[in-house]
């Protein structure tokens, strides 16, 4: 279940259609591509396929008198989420001619079958596979994309917060890879990397939250001892950035930094709030 929650942390099943329901513009209710490259999509599909099989195999070890409880509390949530991801991501690939629409439709049919089984058990008739009949839960229209998938980013180095050097407090279960950590105001964390490039983009990913003891959420970023650049990432309720943070479960700040010389470099992040 840890992996199930980790994948849902990155993107909840109900957000996989890249739709919104609070907007007045009906365009937000049209299923569309997520801003993911093909490799990211296929990796996530593989991770969910593995989860689907694992939770099904575990069912064989559950006593008969607990089969229904296991299915309702564990197997259905995991397998339905897996098929929801398979449906949405296969459809995205199909819009680009990279997958078969029949496979996306088959994933929808699988959710239907899983839900039918759920509704024959202890909590008979309780589960609705398409709350409010929202577009994200339906079979997706067979349409062609009007723009290509984004290219995979060129990553020089990648870390979780817990990989850094500093006075960090690990936050179990938070972060895309479960490696988030907290910095108290005034504390710093550093990371080392190697590159011969003249500049780089440092992308800092935070758990989206709101200010508590001050009006802002700020940190500074410095590379190779350069003057620190101050960045803030607080948002306001229902702002566009707030909405994106909720959907992605991340607050992101990108900063272009010059790299002096070649070889090894050090990034230092210091919390201000």
Task: Report each predicted region and the residues it spans.
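Extracytoplasmic
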Residues: 127, 131-273
């Amino acid at each position: 279940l840890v992996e199930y929650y980790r994948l849902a942390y990155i993107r909840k099943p109900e957000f996989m259609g890249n739709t919104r329901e609070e907007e007045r513009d009906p365009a937000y209710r049209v299923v569309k591509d997520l801003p993911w490259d093909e490799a990211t999509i296929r990796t996530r599909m593989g991770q969910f396929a593995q989860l689907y099989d694992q939770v099904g195999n575990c069912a064989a070890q559950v006593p008969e008198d607990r089969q229904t409880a296991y299915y309702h509390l564990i197997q259905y949530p995991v397998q339905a989420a897996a098929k929801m991801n398979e449906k949405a991501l296969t459809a995205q690939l199909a819009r680009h001619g990279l997958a078969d629409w029949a496979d996306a439709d088959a994933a929808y049919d699988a959710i239907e079958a899983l839900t039918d089984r759920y509704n024959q058990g202890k909590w008979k008739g309780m589960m609705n596979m398409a709350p409010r009949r929202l577009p994200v839960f339906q079979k997706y229209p067979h349409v062609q994309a009007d723009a290509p998938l984004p290219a995979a980013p060129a990553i020089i180095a990648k870390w979780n917060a817990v990989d850094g050097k500093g006075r960090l407090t690990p936050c179990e279960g938070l972060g895309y890879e479960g490696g988030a950590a907290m910095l108290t105001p005034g504390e710093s964390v550093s990371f080392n990397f190697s590159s011969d490039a003249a500049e780089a983009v440092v992308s800092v990913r935070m758990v989206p939250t709101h200010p508590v003891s001050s009006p802002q959420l700020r940190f500074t970023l410095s590379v190779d001892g350069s003057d620190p650049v101050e960045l803030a990432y607080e948002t306001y309720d229902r702002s566009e950035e707030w909405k994106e943070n909720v959907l992605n479960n991340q607050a992101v700040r990108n900063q272009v930094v010059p790299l002096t010389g070649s070889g090894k470099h050090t990034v230092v992040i210091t919390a201000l709030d």
